[in-house]
From Swiss-Prot:
Cofactor(s) listed in the protein's UniProt record: Mg(2+)
Protein name per Swiss-Prot or TrEMBL: Enolase
InterPro entries the UniProt entry points to: Enolase, Enolase-like_C_sf, Enolase-like_N, Enolase_C, Enolase_CS, Enolase_N
Matches recorded under PANTHER family: ENOLASE
Gene behind the chain: eno
GO BP term, example: glycolytic process
Cofactor comment: Binds a second Mg(2+) ion via substrate during catalysis.
Localization per record: Cytoplasm; Secreted; Cell surface
Length: 456
């Protein structure tokens, strides 16, 4: 039977914050079916593809997405019906050209992405392949090392913590399932530690982490490391720390305003702030350590810490190949966060990952703070062998859904599932270390290629 697109239909559903989002169904002539739901961010980069919302305050406080849904059911459906779902590049190119804008503001990135992902899922169903294997069909796959957001602050929580995410990284294990077990044990132990120290854990943040008021940002790290030890693990051996300060959120008039500590820091002082932490704690990754507009500062940050820790650009690069290219040229950061809805199509996401891999940058596949039960990013992380994933804490079913999908994939792959551990975090070393870099070529559709570099 034919793999041509027969039907495209969108609806408005709710995300994990109770806000409207777009869900799309695609049916092929063969009867194969694909569905995808689109996530949404809280702290968003200024150069992200545009998420189209209606702005009618009488409906969902202005956050409804009926126009995006209408765009899928009319303009986009008419444009892609009859196209071959196995040709992902053509599907995405058709929608990009139909939109005609640089940031997908006319049709909405949420409309376009929903169709892009649902089509890919339908194509996988047509070929009777698991989604990750449809994206890349090889013998062995890298299971991603999870960054688990156990303390939430900033825009993700209603507390006094300036920095947005304090994450545990269970990299000192042989399998993903062992790492996940460690993460859950540390997460539950952290609750006991926070309560014992007099902090409230009555609620959790958008991504499922605890959201206590703390005397300082550093207190979050201290509490986490205490929990790691009390759970029976060794910091720097079994469990490491990753940070996402989301610095654009507290960057005001050229200064970094840490209100919880009553500090107003220059770029150089902010870099020194991080450098002291890197020397003191087992930190392996810092995401958005400086503001997205502070490119000169990013250059200084990379020069000072780029050979010691992974420096991830999220708001900085917004999964955009053209912006990433500028960063690579200027020697800024050494890693990129991959968020599908920042760029709006699967094809462009692959292009960004390919560019990053060819430049020696790592890729971290990521969720958004406004998530759904959709598990596509779990399959994407495995398919591209990115080696890293951010999908929240060990609570809230929208986060757990991704971890459970990774457990299923690891079980299915058996001995062909490789957990890279600390080797997933690639950055230059002061020591002369011989590195073996494996290039995995991912064939997507007829022409798409993703190159992912993995240190062995």
């Amino acid at each position: 039977m034919s793999s041509q697109i027969k039907q495209v239909f969108a609806r408005q559903i709710l995300d994990s914050r109770g806000n409207p989002t777009v869900e799309v169904d695609v049916v092929l002539e063969s009867g194969a079916f694909g569905r995808a739901a689109v996530p949404s961010g809280a702290s968003t980069g200024i150069r992200e593809a545009l998420e189209l919302r209606d702005g009618n305050k009488a409906l969902f406080i202005g956050k409804s997405v009926y126009k995006a849904v209408e765009n899928v059911n009319t303009k986009i459906a008419q444009a892609v019906k009859g196209l071959d779902a196995l040709d992902q590049r053509l599907i995405d190119k058709t929608m990009i050209e139909l939109d005609g804008s640089e940031n997908k503001k006319n049709l909405g990135a949420n409309a376009i992405l929903g169709v892009s992902l649902a089509t890919a899922r339908a194509a996988a169903s047509h070929l009777r392949k698991p989604f990750y294997r449809y994206l890349m069909d090889v013998k062995e796959y890298l299971m991603p090392v999870p960054m688990m957001n156990v303390i939430n602050g900033g825009s993700h929580a209603d507390n006094n913590v300036d920095m947005q995410e304090f994450m545990i990284v269970p990299a000192g294990f042989d399998t993903f399932s062992e790492a996940l077990r460690c993460g859950t044990e540390v997460f539950h132990t952290l609750k006991k530690v926070l309560i014992a120290d007099g902090y409230s854990v009555a609620g959790v943040g958008d991504e499922g982490g605890y959201a206590p008021d703390l005397p300082s940002n550093e207190a979050a790290i201290e509490a986490i490391l205490k929990a790691v030890k009390e759970a029976g693990y060794e910091p720097g051996k079994h469990v490491f720390i990753a940070l996402d300060p989301a610095s654009s959120e507290f960057y005001k008039d050229g200064k970094y305003e840490l209100k919880s500590e009553n500090k107003s820091l220059t770029t150089e002082e902010m870099i020194d702030y991080y450098a002291a932490w890197v020397e003191k704690y087992p930190i392996v990754s810092i995401e958005d350590g400086l503001a997205e507009e502070d490119w000169a500062g990013w250059k200084l940050l990379t020069e000072k810490l780029g050979n010691k820790v992974q420096l991830v650009g999220d708001d900085l690069f917004v999964t955009n190949p053209s912006i990433l290219a500028k960063g690579i040229e200027k020697g800024i950061a050494n890693s990129i966060l991959i968020k599908l809805n920042q760029i709006g199509t699967l094809t462009e996401t692959f292009e960004a990952m390919a560019m990053a891999g060819q430049a020696g940058y790592t890729c971290v596949v990521s969720h958004r703070s406004g998530e759904t039960s959709d598990t596509i990013i779990a399959d994407l992380a495995v398919a591209t062998c990115s080696g890293q994933i951010k999908t929240g804490s060990l609570s809230r079913s929208d986060r757990i859904a991704k971890y459970n999908q990774l457990l299923r994939i690891e079980e299915e792959l058996g001995e062909n599932a490789i957990y890279p551990g600390i080797k997933a975090f690639v950055f230059n070393s002061d020591e002369e270390v011989e590195e073996v870099v494996q290039e995995i070529i991912v064939e997507d559709s007829e022409a798409e290629k993703v190159v992912v570099q993995v240190e062995e």
